[in-house]
Structures are given as structure tokens and as C-alpha cells.
UniProtKB/Swiss-Prot annotation:
Residues bearing glycans: N149, N177, N280, N382
Regions crossing the membrane: 423-443
Biological function: Receptor protein kinase. Could play a role in a differentiation signal. Controls formative cell division in meristems. Regulates epidermal cell differentiation in many organs. During floral organogenesis, required to maintain the interlocking of the palea and lemma, and fertility. Triggers culm elongation.
Membrane topology type: Single-pass type I membrane protein
InterPro entries xref list: Kinase-like_dom_sf (IPR011009), Prot_kinase_dom (IPR000719), Protein_kinase_ATP_BS (IPR017441), RCC1/BLIP-II (IPR009091), Reg_chr_condens (IPR000408), Ser-Thr/Tyr_kinase_cat_dom (IPR001245), Ser/Thr_kinase_AS (IPR008271), TNFR/NGFR_Cys_rich_reg (IPR001368)
Protein name: Serine/threonine-protein kinase-like protein CR4
Coiled-coil blocks: none
Post-translational modification, as annotated: Autophosphorylated.
Gene3D superfamilies hit by this protein: Phosphorylase Kinase, domain 1, Regulator of chromosome condensation 1/beta-lactamase-inhibitor protein II, Transferase(Phosphotransferase) domain 1
Lineage summary: Eukaryota, Viridiplantae, Streptophyta, Embryophyta, Tracheophyta
Assembly, per entry: Homodimer.
Recorded family membership: Belongs to the protein kinase superfamily. Ser/Thr protein kinase family.
Keywords of this entry: ATP-binding, Cell membrane, Developmental protein, Disulfide bond, Endosome, Glycoprotein, Kinase, Membrane, Nucleotide-binding, Receptor, Repeat, Serine/threonine-protein kinase, Signal, Transferase, Transmembrane, Transmembrane helix
Region 7 X 36 AA repeats, annotated ranges: 31-328
Provenance organism: Oryza sativa subsp. japonica (Rice)
Length: 901
């Protein structure tokens, strides 16, 4: 696109009594164009004055400032500019080599501007020294320009009310006599020499090589060059396609494309276009009423006069549907002048101020003029609404009038039928009430007579026995009903927890975070607990939200590898949660604590076991909780270890409920811990369950290497940047924790490293889901253990979601392998934990059931199954031959585009 189009249906600035929005004029909407494709930009409709862009040119779409408010916007070839709300200076973005990103230079210090206009490769701004006045003094105006062959300061005699830009030229409109003047390159268009003298305009709109203006009588006048390459184009509205041959309709405003122009009719605010358009171009929608329009080189966009305020485009190569709501005009601080009314959003009078900032500003739109021949004016235009025309059914001359009158007649018939129906329903209701009343009176009379009748002793005895039998049966049912009640978290008093922790003394403190402290306590019944006490913060609302989030989730979730919540306390500003006490602290303390013996105690088998158990807990959150739960703070310090060295996932303060479809993204502000935070979530605010997968991948790298997620004592402080190249190079030995001796066979650890590498991929759709991660880790654990006869904490098929640990398999007890009876006795001494059922979860699913959906994996991998009689002797080799299968799972591409553009 070679032309800069912007038009709005409202008063641009405080001192603009009429419009001058041309191709490159400033308004609430603008379009850029060029080799990289078209882009539509507009001010948001929520009154924030923030700009949003949508289109093909990434430099304009992603370069748009997301937190800077603007008065209005304009655009050119590969760039867009806006007038800053705070400083009244222009700010540009995009990829144009002549108009740089930021505030254009050179810039006069302290200069303020009231109007912008952008051409193909230049930008001009109308300077003002006093806010609200265009001229430096009463007789002169200053216009600064930047860009290709246009960088200069122009001093014009006379006050200028508006400016508009074409491809290589600029035009302005004098405020006093409403005449037009132009400057720039004359060689291509001839616009400067052909500019009319002593012709008064309400507004002007420059196109590529022509200018159109609305005269004081609302007629349109155009001058300049028309397209002569007729073999490449087809006329849109006139016989010869000449842009200078204009329609006779009265117009509110006009805009210009490269070789075409469009205007808004005063009568009905519908769009009329004329001039040349390319082949296969879409026409303007018939009957479309708009608030504002803006033209590109070969297309035009408009803001429909609907409550949605979602723009639509027509022509060639432009975006046809735009999924964003924009402001229909620029806000002004003065009251609306004669011929304008105040815009009220959603049809509510006075609510138009919500689309403007500050609150005392408003958005003014021009009134429609007159009514069609078959209509009459039922109410005139006033300060709060446009004029209203009603069809005269006795003078119908259009299809719309005929259709309206027929619908009105049908409406009257329906109203009459509805009235008759109400009468009929009332009669039926009266009859029903009468019958019911008679029946009730009869029943009461019969009951009264029965109570006062004389019954025999046998009948009384029979009735008594029947009543006793019923009560007895009812007593039997009652205990079963009580058994169905679900246990909830217990509520403790603050005094009870204060006594249990010794007054929350430092001696009982076992951990401290940014928002809470954890104390060890002993309840009156001797139960050892961990009490999490929230640190009193200034943001009480946020602290209370995190407290109730964690309380709500933990009281409903039920899994062996999630931290068990025993109770809570909320007393004034005090908020406390009571958990099971984890005797061995956190995984972080073992891997990175000051005591080196803790690190040595975690041999490779225990480390991988902890990883498998934590993965199962996260898999439960993603796959079996309904709706799914996204933890958002998976890290080694939030994986706790109990007295049996089983892992528990803890700290649900940042957790949120995900959508029922786990692949659907959420738009959330980033929350979590640096080093573990998903890069895609951090940059794009694109949150899915794959964000937890990334954090868990970092934890796997910690388990393998013994290094912190971020450790600045190393040259490469980020563990992902350090570990991933080693894994891809196959140098696993350099990755492993030097504190532990590497196992004789590194194959299992190589598989775990490969899983971690896939988990920390930059794009979420390339990461595996947690069920696939868990399956791969279970296989790696089995391969690491080498044989089912070796004492192992948990085998891949021995854990059921919802129970802590299972007894060893019966087949293992009767195995022909050399397993001693003492080993079996020790293995049977396991702690079984029972939890209340969870009403937010699906039924528990075993790891073997999880893999039933991928039946015959051995056949797909080219492996053969051994005979059942040889299982005891060959299961170790069978487990070693298993290969992990992790395929990426990602949301659909259209969802990604929808949530980011």
C-alpha cells in the first residue's frame, strides 16, 4: 500500500469544528501497507487510549507499544505513528528506513503537536506552543516534517486547522477561510498546482496522487492524478473509473486510497466508493453504516455502527475480519458542537465518557442529515443521540421499507395473539386452582373424619407395629448415609497452633520463603505437623487469595504424591495451613544444602524414584483432576520428602484451574520462580500445562547434575543453557553430579537426560505431556534397578493414584530368583495411607492402565514378548530394551494465533 489512510466520524481535536481526516491524517484508526503486508491499528474501545495492531507485518504488529497511551494514530508504508497522550509528541514504530522507531529526530526541545499525517515514507506534525491552539501566534503556523525528501520545518502564514498526507506530498486546511494549500513533490501527482483557489472545504482527505474534500454544501470535490493503466484495473462505481468523477451524494467525510476514494454519506452514514479498484476486489458491504473509515492503497476499512465496534475491510489484499474492538473516534475535552452528538456505548446515554480518558472528555459523532423519501424523522439529533427515521408504510419505495412494514404487521398480530393467549392461560389457571382447592378441602375433610373415627384394638396394634417397623428400617439406613459424607480439612484455633509451635518461636521454624514461614509443631494428640504461616503483607487481598487458593485445592485433591493438608486457621489477619510433617525436608535441601551428607544419601535410585513420584503427582494434576490444575511453581524446594523418602509436591499458592481441554491456552500474567519459569509463558503470557512440564524438566536437570537452576558461580549460570548442549552432544558423564559415583550402565540416566532435554524445549507444543514423561521415567527407573528382585521403592506398575505405596507383587514373592525371605518380610512392612475421596477428581488410574491406550508398544518397537514361564529370568533384559516414546503435544495453531494476535 502506498497511501496513508485514516478517517474518523468524530471531531479530532479540541479546536476542530469539522473534519480533515485524509489518507494520512490522524484518527482513532489507521492502516499501514507495504511489501510485508497490511496492518490495521486502532485505539482500544475501553478508554485506555492504548493501541492494538493486527495484520501481516510483524514489525508493526509486535512493535506497537502495549502500555503507552495515544491521542490518535496514523500510518504509512511499513510504519505507524501515534501522538503521545502525555507529551503531545509523535512516536513511531515499524520497519520503514526513512521514519525511524521512536520520537522522530531532529525534534525541537519541548515542542508539542496537535495533529499528525503520514505519507509513504514521511511524517508531518502540526506544532502548537500552547495546548489546544494550533498556531504559534494568531497569524502563523509551524509544521515539522521528517522522512524521505521531506525533513524540514515549514512556517505557514495563517492558522492551520488540519493536515493530511498523500504518497509524496502534504496538504493543509486553513482555519479561518477553510481554503486548502499543499507542499511536497509536484512531479508525480500535480496536486500542488491543481489545488483549487478560494474554494471552502469542511474537511479534506489526501490519497496516493489525489486529494478529495467535502465542500461547505456537503458535496465532494477531487483533484489530482487518476490511474491510466486501465488494463490492470476495473472501475468500481463510475463508467471510466476516474477518481475525480465523484458521486452527487452529500458526504460527512472522505478518504483516499492510491487510485480510489470512499466517503460516508450524510443521509444514512453508509459508505460510497469511486475510482479504480484491482480485479477480484471485494465491494463495500451493502447497507453498511459506519462511524469511521480509513483507506489503504487498494483496500478500505471501517468501524461499523454496532455495539461490537469490530472493524471490517473490503477491497484487495486487506484483512477482511478483525478480532478487536476499537474506538470510533478521537476524544475531545469540549462539549459537542452543533451538528454532533455524544457517543454512548451500548446504547446507554452518558456512558460514552467511558471510552475516553480523562473522565471529563467525550467522543462526538456527526449527526445524520435528512431521511429517505419513504421515511420521516421521528426524533431529531440531540446532544446524546443521532436523529431517528421511521418508515412511512403508506409511501414505501424500497425493499427495506416493505420488509419493515410487513414485520410490523406480523408483530401486531403476534401481540394480539399473545394477549389472547394470556387470557386463555389465565382461564386454565383459574380452573386448575379451583379443582385443586376443591380436592384439598375434600382431603382435609376425609382426614378429619378419620382422626375422629372409632378404630378397633387390632387395627391400632397393626398400625403401631407398622410404624415401629418403618422407624427400625430407617435407623438402619442412617449410618450408611453418614458413611457417605466426605471428610473436609479440620479448622484449628489460632491458640491451639500457637501452643503447638511454642509461640511460633525461631527454634521451631524449619523453613522460610518470600511470603510465608513454616514451623514444626506437635498437636495435643501427639501428631507432628508442619504449620505454614503467611507473612503479613501490605497487599492483604493478594495474600488472602493465595491462601484460599491453596486451601481450596489441597482440601479437594487426593493423591499419594501431593502434600496432605490436615487443617487450616483463619483468624483476623492470621492465615495458617496445617500439613503432614515431612521428616526429610525438601529435595532442594538434599541437593543444594550445606550438609554434604544429605546429598550423598540420595543415590541414583532414590533420585530417580523421587523424580518418578513427583511426575506422578504432577500428572495427576494435569490428567486426572477435573478441571485440570496448573501448579505454576514446580521447583526442587516445593518437592518434599517424607520419612520413607517418598516425594510430595507442595505449595499450591500460585496454582490455577485450567480449562477442561488441557490444550487450550490461558492468558495469564507470569508467576513463578526464575530459572524454572517457562520462557513462552514469560514472554507471551501463553499458559498451558506444558509450563509445568518445563519447570519439571529443570528439576530433572538438578537431580542429574546437582547444580542449582540458576547458579552465578558458574560461567553459564542457567542450568538449561549449560546442560542441554551436553545432552545433545552425548556427554552425559560431564552432566552427572560428581558427588555420586556414576552407575556401571549409563543407559538409564541417558534416557532421563533425554526426557529433561525435551521438557525444556523453548516452544510448549514441542514438549511432551506429563503422562508421557512419567512413562519414560518409570521405564528408566526399571532399567536402572536392573531386576525386580532388587529392593526398589516403587516399580512402574505398583502405584495407584490415591495411595502412597503398594505391597510388593505376589509374583515377586514367588519368583524363582534368589530373593531371600528376609527381604520379602522387610518389603511387606510398608505404610498404607487412606484418604478421603475427592469430588474434584476422576477415579484413580494405575500406571499400567495409563499405558493400555498404547497397546502393542513392544510390537511397534520390534520387540518380542518372552514366555510367561521365563518372566522371572528375563524381565531385567526386557526392561532394559524398553525405549521411551515421547511425542510432542501442542494446542491447535489457530488457538495460538487467536490468543496472541
Amino acid at each position: 500500500m502506498d497511501i496513508v489512510p485514516v478517517v474518523a466520524l468524530c471531531c479530532c481535536l479540541v479546536l476542530l469544528p469539522s473534519w480533515a481526516y485524509g489518507l494520512g491524517s490522524m484518527a482513532s484508526i489507521a492502516v499501514s501497507y507495504g511489501e510485508d503486508g497490511p496492518v490495521f491499528c486502532g485505539l482500544n474501545s475501553d478508554g485506555s487510549h492504548l493501541v492494538t495492531c493486527f495484520g501481516a507485518d510483524a514489525s508493526v504488529v509486535y512493535g506497537a507499544p502495549s502500555r503507552i497511551p495515544f491521542v490518535g494514530v496514523t500510518a504509512g508504508d511499513g510504519f505507524a505513528c501515534g501522538l503521545l497522550l502525555d507529551t503531545n509528541q509523535p512516536y513511531c514504530w515499524g520497519s520503514n528506513s526513512y521514519v525511524k522507531i521512536g520520537v522522530p529526530q531532529p525534534m525541537v526541545e519541548g515542542a508539542m503537536y496537535s495533529e499528525l499525517s503520514a505519507g509513504d515514507n514521511h511524517l508531518c506534525a502540526l506544532r502548537t506552543s500552547v495546548k489546544g491552539f494550533h498556531s504559534v501566534n494568531g497569524d502563523t503556523s509551524v509544521i515539522d516534517c521528517w522522512g524521505y525528501n521531506m525533513t524540514a520545518t515549514h512556517t505557514v502564514t495563517g492558522a492551520v486547522s488540519a493536515i493530511s498526507a498523500g504518497s509524496v506530498f502534504n496538504c493543509g486546511l486553513f482555519a479561518r477561510n477553510r481554503t486548502v494549500f499543499c507542499w511536497g513533490d509536484e512531479s508525480v501527482s500535480g496536486v500542488i498546482g491543481l489545488a483549487p483557489r478560494n474554494v471552502r472545504f469542511q474537511s479534506i482527505g489526501a490519497g496516493g496522487y489525489h486529494v478529495c474534500g467535502v465542500l461547505e454544501n456537503a458535496q465532494v470535490f477531487c483533484w489530482g492524478r487518476s490511474l491510466e493503466m486501465q488494463q490492470m484495473s476495473t472501475p468500481s462505481s463510475t463508467d471510466d473509473g476516474d477518481v475525480n468523477i465523484v458521486p452527487m451524494d452529500a458526504m460527512v467525510s472522505v478518504v483516499g486510497g492510491r487510485f480510489h476514494a470512499c466517503g460516508i454519506r450524510s443521509l444514512d452514514h453508509q459508505v460510497a466508493c469511486w475510482g479504480f479498484t484491482l480485479q477480484n476486489s471485494t465491494l463495500a458491504p451493502k447497507g453498511l453504516r459506519v462511524y469511521a473509515i480509513v483507506a489503504g492503497d487498494y483496500f478500505t476499512c471501517g468501524v461499523p455502527a454496532e455495539t461490537s465496534l469490530k472493524p471490517m475491510c473490503w477491497g484487495h489484499s486487506g484483512p477482511l475480519a478483525l478480532p478487536m474492538a476499537v474506538s470510533p473516534g478521537i476524544c475531545v475535552s469540549d462539549s459537542c458542537s452543533h451538528g454532533y452528538y455524544e457517543y454512548a456505548n451500548h446504547g446507554e446515554v452518558g456512558s460514552g465518557s467511558k471510552t475516553c480518558k480523562p473522565a471529563n472528555s467525550r467522543l462526538c459523532l456527526p449527526c445524520s442529515v435528512g431521511c429517505p423519501d419513504d421515511s420521516y424523522e421521528s426524533s431529531p439529533c440531540n446532544a446524546t443521540a443521532d436523529r431517528v427515521c421511521q418508515f412511512d408504510c403508506s409511501k414505501c419505495a424500497s425493499d427495506e421499507c416493505v420488509s419493515f412494514c410487513l414485520s410490523q404487521k406480523r408483530t401486531k398480530n403476534r401481540k394480539f395473539m399473545a394477549f389472547q393467549l394470556r387470557i386463555f392461560v389465565a382461564e386454565i389457571a383459574f380452573a386448575v386452582i379451583l379443582v385443586f382447592s376443591v380436592t384439598a378441602i375434600a382431603c382435609l375433610y376425609v382426614r378429619y373424619k378419620l382422626r375422629h373415627c372409632q378404630c378397633s384394638k387390632n387395627e391400632l396394634r397393626l398400625a403401631k407395629n407398622t410404624t415401629y417397623s418403618f422407624r427400625k428400617d430407617n435407623m438402619k439406613i442412617q449410618p450408611d448415609v453418614e458413611d457417605l459424607k466426605i471428610r473436609r480439612a479440620q479448622e484449628f484455633s489460632y491458640e491451639e497452633l500457637e501452643q503447638a509451635t511454642g509461640g511460633f518461636s525461631e527454634d521451631s521454624q524449619v523453613g522460610k520463603g518470600s511470603f510465608s514461614c513454616v514451623f514444626k509443631g506437635i498437636l495435643r494428640d501427639g501428631t507432628v505437623v508442619a504449620v505454614k504461616r503467611a507473612i503479613k503483607a501490605s497487599d492483604v487481598k493478594k495474600s488472602s487469595k493465595e491462601f484460599h487458593t491453596e486451601l481450596d485445592l489441597l482440601s479437594r485433591l487426593n493423591h499419594a504424591h501431593l502434600l496432605n493438608l490436615l487443617g487450616y486457621c483463619e483468624d483476623g489477619s492470621e492465615r495458617l495451613l496445617v500439613y503432614e510433617f515431612m521428616a526429610h525436608g525438601s529435595l532442594y535441601q538434599h541437593l543444594h544444602g550445606k550438609d554434604p551428607n544429605l546429598k550423598k544419601r540420595l543415590n541414583w535410585a532414590r533420585r530417580v524414584t523421587i523424580a518418578v513420584q513427583a511426575a506422578r503427582g504432577i500428572e495427576y494434576l494435569h490428567g486426572y483432576a477435573c478441571p485440570p490444575v496448573i501448579h505454576r511453581d514446580i521447583k526442587s524446594s516445593n518437592i518434599l520428602i517424607d520419612e520413607d523418602h517418598n516425594a510430595r509436591v507442595a505449595d499450591f499458592g500460585l496454582s490455577i484451574l485450567g480449562p477442561a481441554d488441557s490444550g487450550t491456552p490461558l492468558s495469564e500474567l507470569p508467576a513463578g520462580t526464575l530459572g524454572y519459569l517457562d520462557p513462552e509463558y514469560y514472554r507471551l503470557h501463553y499458559l498451558t500445562t506444558k509450563s509445568d512440564v518445563y519447570s519439571f524438566g529443570v528439576v530433572l536437570l538438578e537431580i542429574l547434575s546437582g547444580r542449582k537452576a540458576i547458579d552465578m558461580q558458574f560461567e553459564e549460570g542457567n542450568i538449561v543453557e549449560w546442560a542441554v548442549p551436553l545432552i545433545k552432544a552425548g556427554d552425559i558423564s560431564a552432566l552427572l553430579d560428581p558427588v555420586l559415583s556414576p552407575p556401571s550402565d549409563l543407559e538409564a540416566l541417558k534416557k532421563i537426560a533425554a526426557v529433561a532435554c525435551k521438557c525444556v524445549r523453548m516452544r510448549a507444543k514441542d514438549r511432551p505431556s506429563m503422562d508421557k514423561v512419567t512413562t519414560a521415567l518409570e521405564r528408566a527407573l526399571a532399567l536402572l534397578m536392573g531386576s525386580p528382585c532388587i529392593e526398589q521403592p516403587i516399580l512402574p506398575t505398583e502405584v495407584v493414584l490415591g495411595s502412597s505405596r503398594m505391597h510388593k507383587k505376589v509374583s515377586q514373592r514367588s519368583s524363582n530368583h534368589s530373593c531371600s525371605e528376609n527381604d520379602l518380610v522387610d518389603g511387606d512392612d510398608q505404610r498404607i495411607e487412606y484418604r478421603a475421596p475427592s469430588w474434584i477428581t476422576f477415579p484413580s488410574v494405575t500406571s499400567s492402565q495409563r499405558r493400555k491406550s498404547s497397546a502393542s508398544e513392544a510390537d511397534m518397537d520390534g520387540r518380542t514378548t518372552t514366555d510367561g514361564r521365563n518372566v522371572g529370568s528375563s524381565i531385567g533384559d526386557g526392561l532394559r530394551s524398553l525405549e521411551e516414546e515421547i511425542s510432542p503435544a501442542s494446542p491447535q495453531e489457530n488457538l495460538y494465533l487467536q490468543h496472541n494476535f
